[in-house]
From Swiss-Prot:
This is DNA-directed RNA polymerase subunit beta. InterPro entries: DNA-dir_RNA_pol_bsu_ext_1_sf, DNA-dir_RNA_pol_bsu_external_1, DNA-dir_RNA_pol_su2, DNA-dir_RNAP_su2_dom, DNA-dir_RNAP_su2_hyb_sf, RNA_pol_bsu_bac, RNA_pol_bsu_CS, RNA_pol_bsu_protrusion. One of its GO terms (molecular function) is DNA binding. It comes from the Bacteria.
C-alpha cells in the first residue's frame, strides 16, 4: 500500500474489520458538478447538452414578433474571464463573476413574399449580464462574502395518488385523490367527494365535476362511460328479457330468482348468495344466457343512446336509469338489444356515471366555457380567449413543462408495465389502445394521460392498487445549485422576451441591431436577487472545515417551492426507510427545523433525474462481487440487500443459513442465495459529521445528533491537535474542505517560508509550454465569516519529494492533513466539590497556561469618508480633541500602524466631519480670530475600538474612489502587494531558467560547435568549464554544428522569451488592477478596513463539548497543584461529572476515554524507546504489533528505516486510532491495546486529592478524550452596563449586548426580593435603576455631590399603563394624598 507524503508521517491504526471496498467520494462533488453542468464552460458551444444555461436559452429563443415578420434566434453563449480573482473580490467587496455574452441572430422576413423569404440577417454578440462563478471549494463570493447555495429537497414532478386518511368526513370514509404536479405550470387535482362523485380542480381553485374536463377534451357521455365501465348485455324478447351471463360478475350477489342450466336444473336457488362453487358449476354447464324477470333490469344504467330506428328519436340517453316506464317505452320502440353498465357496491363503483349526472354542461364548448369561468371569473368568454386558455393550461410547451423527471415518474405510475389479471376489462382495453410507454415522452399532458390518471384513481376507489408515500425518497428529488440557477436565469429571460417581442416590430422599420433589442438588466436582477437574497443562498458557516463541508452537503425541504416550517407535519420530518444511505438519520437541527434540514450521507450522490442514490455491491449466487451499482430509492425497493457486516468467507461467499437483509423498507432474514446486493460500508447511512464520532454505535441517537451538530461549532485552536481516537475519515474531510493545501503536481520543494511554498515540478508532469513551477501562497491570519482565524502552515521542508495530491500545508483545525477540531485532554470522571454539578466542567490551570484552547478571532472594523452637504469628511491625523497618547498609534495619514495593541475606546482611524454653522459667542469669535478657522467647524467621528474588545492590528486596507488622490498609507499597501507579486514571478522565472539551462547543458556538453563567444573555434567540442565561463544568456550565441541541436536551442530561447513576456504582462495587469480606483458605494470617497486579532483564552463561562453530545460550561479553573493526580504525580486536565453519562446513554465517550489512554500510553512507550536510541528494527517490531495484531493491517514493510523513526517520533505523543462507525474497536481489542501498553485492565486508577494528598475512596475512570471549545464564548455574551440607551415609550433600559442594555429584573426576581423583605432594594430596582426619569437624574446629581440619597418617584411604565387604560375610553386619575 502506497502512503502519501503526509500519511506516512503519522499512520492512523484502524480497527476496521474489512478492507474499504469504495473510497469516500469527493465530498463537494454534488455542488461542483451541478454548477459545472449548468455553465458547461469547458464544452465547445456546438457540443453543449441541452441543460443548464443552454436549456434556458433554447426554451425562450427564437422570439418572434407579433406579426411574425421578424425573429431573434439564439446561436451560442460565451463566458468571459472574471475581472478579479476570488481573493481580490473578497477584499474589495465584489462578486466573483464572469461576463456572459450570447451570439444572437436577427432574421427579418420579406412580408410581401408569398412564402417565407429571408430579407435580412444580422448577427451580433450581446452582453447578457454577469453569472457568479463557483470557487474551487464549492462556494460563491457575493459582494465580498462567501455564500453557499443549499440544495433543496422538493416533491418530484409527476402524478401522486393519496387519500385523506379518513380525516375529512365524519364517517371516516377514505377520500382518494390524485395530483399531477408539473415542473412548471398549473397543478391538476382529481378528488372524490363523500358521495363518490369525482371532481377536478386546477391550481387549487374551485372544484368542478371531472366529466367537465373529459367533455372539454372532446369526449361525449357514451365515450366517457365506455372508457371507465364494462357493459352487461340484455336481449328483450316480448315480455321477458335474456341476460348474457358472465359468471364472474355474479360472485357475491344474492340471486333474486332461480338460476337454472339448459336442462332446467336449479344451480342457484332464489335468495341464496352466489359463491365461487356456483360460478364453477355455471361454467361447466356452459350457461351463456339466462332469462331474467323485469325487476332484474330496473335500476340499471343505460350505456349508450338508444334511437328509435323508425322516427330517429332518442328513446333513452346514455347514463339514464331504467325504470318501468322506460322499459315499456323501449319495448314499444322495438328495441331488441340493450347494454347497461356493470356496477356493484364492492369493487365496481358507478363513480363516473354519478359524476356525469351532476355535470350540467351539454357539449365540449360549454365545458370549456365552464373551465374558463372558473379560471377567470368575471371575464367575458370569447371564443379565442376560451380556446387559448384551455390549450395553454396543459398542452402548451411555453406554459406547461412536466420535465423529463416528471414524465418518467408519470409513465411509471400511470402506465404500469404489467397489468394485473384482476383488473377490469375496460382498463385492459385502455392500456391495449394506448400501447406500452417507456420513460420518455412529451413534456406536456395528452388526453390519454388525463384518462390514465382517472383510471388509476377509479381503481384505487374500487379497492385495487396502492396509494403513494409522499415521504418516500423516490417521490422527492434534489434541486442543486445548477438547477436553481437555471430556473432563475430562465425567469430573467422570460422578462427579456416580453420586451423583445414589443421591440421586434420596430426592428425592420428602424434598422435596429440585436443589442438594441436586448436589455440585460432583468437577467442581472434575477441572478443578483437569487444569489444575494434567496432563502437557499446562505451566509457560509465557516467556523471550521467541517462546518463548511456540512453546509455545502446540506439538503433543505424549505425555500421557494418547498415546505414551510409551520405547515410541515411530523411525517415529513421523520426518518424514512428510504433515507438509508442517502440522507443521514442523525444530523439535523434541534429547533423548529428538525427533520426539514438534512445532511447527505457520506456515499450519497444524485442521479441525472435528481434522485438520491447510494452504492451497493452486487451479489451473484451468494458470491459478493466487486461490481458497485448506485441505486435510487425507486430501484432499491425490488432488491434484497444484505448489510455491510454480513459474514463472508475467504472466497467472498456469504456465510450462514440466514442473512440479515432489507427488502421493501423492512428488515428480514433471507437465505444467502436470495441476496442480490450488499452495503459497501457500515458507515454508509450517516453523514460526514456523524461519521466523525468514534463509537457512534454506543451512543443514544439524541446525543449523537447533538454531537454531530456541536462539532460544527468547534472553534479552531491556536495549535490544532489531531484526535487520538478518530474514525479514519478525518483526512478526507480536511483535504476535501480545501482548508489544507494539496499539491497540484508532484515535484521537489524548492523554497519554504511561512508565507509561501515553491515547488519545482517533475518533468513528466509538465506539459510543453507550461511553467514547471508551482507557487502556493499561504493564507495568513484571514478572517472567516464567523470571525474565526484562517491560517495555513507549511508541513514540508526544502528538498522534500512530494506527489500530486499530497498535503503540503495545514489550515485551520487541521494537523498533518487530518481534521483536528479540539485538543486531547486527560479526563477524570468524578465529582469535585460540586464544581461539576449540572454538566459543569472543571479545568486545570495548566490547560490555560499552555494555550491549549486559546483561539484567535479576527474582527473587521470599517470606516468610510463620505461627501456630506457641508463638505467632504476627511481621514486625517490632525484632530484637535485627541491627545498625544491616542495619536501615537496613528501614522501621518491618520490610520493605525500594523502591530499596534489597542483597547476599547482607542482610535484606529482619525476622521473629521464638517459641522453646521452655529451662532458664535463673542469669546468664540475672538478665539477663532486668533487660532484660525479649522478647529471649530469639524467634529471628531473617528473609528474607535468598540467596548469589550481589545487586540492587535494585523492588517489595514485602504480603498479610494477613482479620481481621488491616494494617501501615503494606501500607496505603501499597493507597493507591498506589487513587491510580493514580483517576488513570486521572479521565483518562477528563476526556476524556469535554471531548468532550461540545465537542459541546455545536458544537450550540448560534448557536442561540436561552429563557433561562439570568447572566440570559440569551429569544430571544438563544448565543455562544462567553457559554459561556466560564460554568462547564461550568452549560451544562446553558441553556433552548433548539428542543425537539430541548434533548432532545440532556439526553441528553448523562444520559450524563455515568451515566459518572460507573459510574466511582464501578468505584472502589468496586476499593477493596473491595484492602481485603478476602487468601486465604492455612491457618495463614499474613501474606505478603510482595520483587522484586529483578538486572543481568547479559555475562561469560566466558555462552552465546551465532547463528540458524543456531552456539553457543559467551564465552572472553574483550578491551580494545577489542586487538581486530582495519579500515583506518579500526573495531574488530570479536566474533571467531568460521572452522573452525566448513564441518563444520557452516550457510552461512546467512556470507550473513547479508555482507547485514548491506551493510545497515549503506547505513545509514551515508543517515546521511551526513541530516547533510549533503540534500533529501527526494534521500533518496527513494536509498530508491527500495534498496527497488525488486529484490525485493518498496515504495510510497515514499505517504509524505510528513517521513515519508521520519523513515524515513531510523531507517534510518541500518542498512537492515533481509527474506530470507524459501526465497525469500530471491540472490548477485547481495547483490552489488547491496554495489555500492549502495559496498563492495568479496567481503565480505572486510584487518584489523589491535590489539596490534601489523600487517595479518593474509589478508583476513577481516567483517560484521554478529544474535547472541543465551542463558538459560544463568554466574552461574546457577557457585558456590563453603567449608563446607556433607554426605550422611548417605557423609558426602561434596552436589553441585549448589541444595544448595550441592562439585565432584566423580571417578575420572578421581584418575588425573590419580596420573599427576603428587601423593600428598599426592590424600590431602587423598580424606580431609579429602571424607568423613574426624574429619580434617575436626581441620583446622578447626588452622586456628583458625593451624597448617597435616593428620592424615588413614579415609574414611567405606570404612566404608560394609565395612558393605555385611557385609550380604552376609561377615565383614570391618580389621587395623591
Amino acid at each position: 500500500m502506497a502512503y502519501s507524503y503526509t500519511e506516512k508521517k503519522r499512520i492512523r491504526k484502524s480497527f476496521a474489520k474489512r478492507a474499504a471496498v469504495l473510497n469516500v467520494p469527493f465530498l463537494l462533488a454534488t455542488q461542483i458538478e451541478s454548477f459545472a453542468s449548468f455553465l458547461q464552460a469547458d464544452t465547445p458551444p456546438p457540443s453543449r447538452l441541452n441543460h443548464g444555461l443552454q436549456a434556458a436559452f433554447t426554451s425562450i429563443f427564437p422570439i418572434s414578433s407579433h406579426s411574425g415578420n421578424a425573429r431573434l434566434e439564439f446561436v451560442q453563449y460565451m463566458l468571459g474571464e472574471p475581472a478579479f480573482d476570488v481573493k481580490e473580490c473578497q477584499q474589495r467587496g465584489l462578486t466573483f463573476a464572469s461576463p456572459l455574452r450570447a451570439r444572437v441572430r436577427l432574421v427579418i422576413l420579406d412580408r410581401d413574399a408569398p412564402k417565407e423569404t429571408v430579407k435580412e440577417v444580422k448577427e451580433q454578440e450581446v452582453y447578457m449580464g454577469e453569472i457568479p462563478l463557483m470557487t474551487t471549494t464549492g462556494s460563491f463570493v457575493i459582494n465580498g462574502t462567501e455564500r453557499v447555495i443549499v440544495s433543496q429537497l422538493h416533491r418530484s414532478p409527476g402524478v401522486f395518488f393519496e387519500h385523506d386518511r379518513g380525516k375529512t368526513h365524519s364517517s371516516g370514509k377514505l377520500l382518494f385523490s390524485a395530483r399531477i404536479i408539473p415542473y412548471r405550470g398549473s397543478w391538476l387535482d382529481f378528488e372524490f367527494d363523500p358521495k363518490d362523485a369525482l371532481y377536478f380542480r386546477v391550481d387549487r381553485r374551485r372544484k368542478m365535476p371531472a366529466t367537465i374536463l373529459l367533455r372539454a377534451i372532446g369526449m361525449g357521455p357514451e365515450e366517457i362511460l365506455a372508457t371507465f365501465h364494462d357493459f352487461d348485455a340484455f336481449h328483450l324478447r316480448g315480455n321477458e328479457a335474456a341476460f348474457e351471463l358472465v359468471p364472474d360478475r355474479l360472485r357475491g350477489d344474492v340471486a333474486k330468482f332461480d338460476i337454472t342450466d339448459g336442462a332446467g336444473n336449479v344451480i342457484v336457488a332464489r335468495d341464496k348468495r352466489i359463491t365461487a362453487k356456483h360460478i364453477r358449476e355455471l361454467d361447466q354447464a356452459g350457461v351463456k344466457m339466462i332469462s331474467v324477470p323485469d325487476e332484474f333490469l330496473l335500476g340499471r344504467i343505460i350505456a349508450r343512446n338508444i334511437v328509435d330506428a323508425e322516427t330517429g328519436e332518442i328513446v333513452a340517453r346514455a347514463n339514464d336509469e331504467i325504470t318501468e316506464d322506460l322499459l315499456d317505452k323501449l319495448r314499444d320502440a322495438g328495441v331488441k338489444d340493450l347494454e347497461t353498465l356493470y356496477v356493484n357496491d364492492l369493487d365496481r363503483g358507478a363513480y363516473i356515471s354519478q359524476t356525469l349526472r351532476i355535470d350540467e354542461t351539454a357539449d365540449q364548448w360549454a365545458a370549456r366555457v365552464a373551465i374558463y369561468r372558473m379560471m377567470r371569473p368575471g371575464e367575458p368568454p370569447t371564443e379565442d380567449a376560451v380556446e387559448a386558455l384551455f390549450q395553454g393550461l396543459f398542452y402548451s410547451e411555453e406554459r406547461y413543462d412536466l420535465s423529463s423527471v416528471g414524465r418518467m415518474k408519470f409513465n411509471r405510475r400511470a402506465y404500469p408495465e404489467k397489468i394485473e389479471d384482476k383488473a377490469p376489462s375496460w382498463l385492459k382495453r385502455f392500456y391495449e389502445t394506448v400501447g406500452p410507454r417507456g420513460e420518455e415522452g412529451p413534456a406536456t399532458l395528452s388526453n390519454e394521460d388525463i384518462l390514465a390518471v382517472i383510471g388509476v384513481l377509479v381503481e384505487l376507489r374500487n379497492g385495487r392498487g396502492e396509494i403513494d408515500d409522499i415521504d418516500h425518497l423516490g417521490n422527492r428529488r434534489v434541486r442543486s445549485v445548477g438547477e436553481l440557477a437555471e430556473n432563475q436565469f430562465r425567469a430573467g429571460l422570460v422578462r427579456v422576451e416580453r420586451a423583445v417581442k414589443e421591440r421586434l416590430s420596430q426592428a425592420e422599420s428602424d434598422n435596429l441591431m440585436p443589442h438594441d433589442l436586448i436589455n440585460a438588466k432583468p437577467i442581472s436582477a434575477a441572478i443578483k436577487e437569487f444569489f444575494g437574497s434567496s432563502q437557499l443562498s446562505q451566509f457560509m458557516d465557516q467556523t471550521n472545515p467541517l462546518s463548511e463541508i456540512t453546509h455545502k452537503r446540506r439538503v433543505s425541504a424549505l425555500g421557494p417551492g418547498g415546505l414551510t416550517r409551520e405547515r410541515a407535519g411530523f411525517e415529513v420530518r421523520d426518518v424514512h426507510p428510504t433515507h438509508y444511505g442517502r440522507v443521514c438519520p442523525i444530523e439535523t437541527p434541534e429547533g423548529p427545523n428538525i427533520g426539514l434540514i438534512n445532511s447527505l450521507a457520506v456515499y450519497a450522490q444524485t442521479n441525472r433525474h435528481g434522485f438520491l442514490e447510494t452504492p451497493y455491491r452486487k451479489v451473484v449466487d451468494s458470491k459478493v462481487t466487486d461490481q458497485i451499482d448506485f441505486l435510487s430509492a425507486i430501484e432499491e425497493g425490488q432488491y434484497v440487500i444484505a448489510q455491510a457486516n454480513a459474514e463472508i468467507d475467504a472466497d467472498g461467499m456469504l456465510e450462514g443459513d440466514l442473512v440479515s437483509c432489507r427488502h421493501k423498507g423492512e428488515f428480514a432474514l433471507s437465505t444467502a442465495d436470495q441476496v442480490q446486493y450488499m452495503d459497501v460500508a457500515p458507515g454508509q447511512i450517516v453523514s460526514v459529521a456523524a461519521s466523525l464520532i468514534p463509537f457512534l454505535e454506543h451512543d443514544d441517537a439524541n446525543r449523537a445528533l447533538m454531537g454531530a451538530n456541536m462539532q460544527r461549532q468547534a472553534v479552531p485552536c491556536l495549535r490544532p491537535e489531531k484526535p487520538l481516537v478518530g474514525t479514519g475519515i478525518e483526512r478526507t474531510v480536511a483535504v476535501d474542505s480545501g482548508t489544507a493545501v494539496q499539491a497540484m503536481r508532484g515535484g521537489i520543494v524548492d523554497y519554504v517560508d511561512a508565507n509561501r511554498i515553491v515547488v519545482r515540478v517533475n518533468d513528466d508532469e509538465t506539459l510543453a509550454g507550461e511553467v514547471g513551477v508551482d507557487i502556493y501562497n499561504m493564507i495568513k491570519y484571514t478572517r472567516s465569516n464567523q470571525n474565526t482565524n484562517i491560517n495555513q502552515r507549511p508541513v514540508v521542508k526544502v528538498g522534500d519529494h512530494i506527489g500530486k495530491g499530497d498535503v503540503i500545508a495545514d489550515g485551520a483545525s487541521t494537523d498533518l492533513g487530518e481534521l483536528a477540531l479540539g485538543q486531547n485532554m486527560l479526563v477524570a470522571f468524578m465529582p469535585w466539590n460540586g464544581y461539576n454539578f449540572e454538566d459543569s466542567i472543571l479545568i486545570s490551570e495548566r490547560v490555560v497556561a499552555e494555550d491549549r484552547f486559546t483561539s484567535i478571532h479576527i474582527e473587521e472594523l470599517t470606516v468610510v469618508a463620505r461627501d456630506t452637504k457641508l463638505g467632504p469628511e476627511e481621514i486625517t491625523r490632525d484632530i484637535a480633541s485627541l491627545g498625544e497618547a491616542q495619536l501615537s498609534r496613528l501614522d501621518e495619514s491618520g490610520i493605525v500602524y500594523i502591530g499596534a495593541e489597542v483597547d476599547a475606546g482607542d482610535v484606529l482611524v482619525g476622521k473629521v466631519t464638517p459641522k453646521g454653522e452655529t451662532q458664535l459667542t463673542p469669546e468664540e469669535k475672538l478665539l477663532r480670530a486668533i487660532f484660525g478657522e479649522k478647529a471649530s467647524d469639524v467634529k471628531d467621528t473617528s473609528l474607535r475600538v468598540s467596548s469589550g474588545m481589545n487586540g492587535t492590528v494585523i492588517d489595514v486596507q485602504v480603498f479610494t474612489r477613482e479620481g481621488i488622490e491616494r494617501d501615503k498609507r494606501a500607496q505603501s499597501i499597493i507597493d507591498d502587494m506589487l513587491r510580493s507579486f514580483k517576488t513570486d514571478l521572479a521565483d518562477q522565472m528563476r526556476i524556469v531558467e535554471r531548468d532550461a539551462f540545465a537542459r541546455i547543458r545536458r544537450l550540448i556538453v560534448g557536442q561540436k560547435a561552429n563557433g561562439g563567444p570568447k572566440k570559440l573555434l569551429k569544430g571544438t567540442a563544448i565543455t562544462g568549464e567553457y559554459l561556466d565561463s560564460l554568462e547564461f544568456y550568452h549560451w544562446f550565441d553558441i553556433r552548433m554544428a548539428d542543425e537539430e541541436l541548434a533548432a532545440q536551442l532556439e526553441a528553448i530561447r523562444e520559450g524563455l522569451e515568451k515566459t518572460r513576456k507573459d510574466f511582464d504582462q501578468a505584472f502589468e495587469i496586476k499593477k493596473k488592477k491595484l492602481t485603478q480606483g476602487d468601486e465604492l458605494p455612491p457618495g463614499v470617497q474613501k474606505m478603510v478596513k482595520v483587522y484586529l486579532a483578538v486572543k481568547r483564552r479559555l475562561q469560566p463561562g466558555d462552552k465546551m463539548a465532547g463528540r458524543h453530545g456531552n456539553k457543559g460550561v467551564v465552572s472553574r479553573i483550578v491551580p494545577i497543584e489542586d487538581m486530582p493526580h495519579m500515583a506518579d504525580g500526573t495531574p488530570v486536565d479536566i474533571v467531568l461529572n460521572p452522573l452525566g453519562v448513564p441518563s444520557r446513554m452516550n457510552i461512546g465517550q467512556i470507550l473513547e476515554t479508555h482507547l485514548g489512554w491506551a493510545s497515549k500510553a503506547l505513545g509514551n512507550k515508543i517515546g521511551t524507546m526513541l530516547r533510549a536510541n533503540a534500533a529501527a528494527a526494534e521500533v518496527r517490531e513494536l509498530l508491527e504489533h500495534i498496527y497488525n495484531d488486529n484490525g485493518r493491517p498496515e504495510d510497515m514493510g514499505s517504509l524505510k528505516d528513517d521513515e519508521v523513526i520519523e513515524l515513531a517520533s510523531n507517534l510518541s505523543k500518542g498512537v492515533p486510532f481509527a474506530t470507524p462507525v459501526f465497525d469500530g474497536a471491540k472490548e477485547e481489542e481495547i483490552e489488547a491495546m491496554f495489555e500492549l501498553a502495559g496498563l492495568q485492565p479496567g481503565g480505572q486508577v486510584t487518584l489523589y486529592d491535590g489539596r490534601t494528598g489523600d487517595a479518593f475512596d474509589r478508583q476513577v475512570t481516567v483517560g484521554y478524550k478529544h474535547v472541543l471549545k465551542l463558538h459560544h464564548l463568554v466574552d461574546d455574551k457577557m457585558h456590563a452596563r453603567s449608563t446607556g440607551p433607554y426605550s422611548l415609550v417605557t423609558q426602561q433600559p434596552l436589553g441585549g449586548k448589541a444595544q448595550f442594555g441592562g439585565q432584566r429584573f423580571g417578575e420572578m426576581e421581584v418575588w425573590a426580593l419580596e420573599a427576603y423583605g428587601a423593600a428598599y432594594t426592590l424600590q431602587e430596582m423598580l424606580t431609579v435603576k429602571s424607568d423613574d426619569v426624574t429619580g434617575r437624574t436626581k441620583v446622578y446629581e447626588s452622586i456628583v455631590k458625593g451624597e448617597h440619597k435616593i428620592d424615588a418617584g413614579m415609574p414611567e411604565s405606570f404612566n404608560v399603563l394609565v395612558k393605555e387604560i385611557r385609550s380604552l375610553a376609561i377615565d383614570i386619575d391618580l389621587d395623591t394624598y
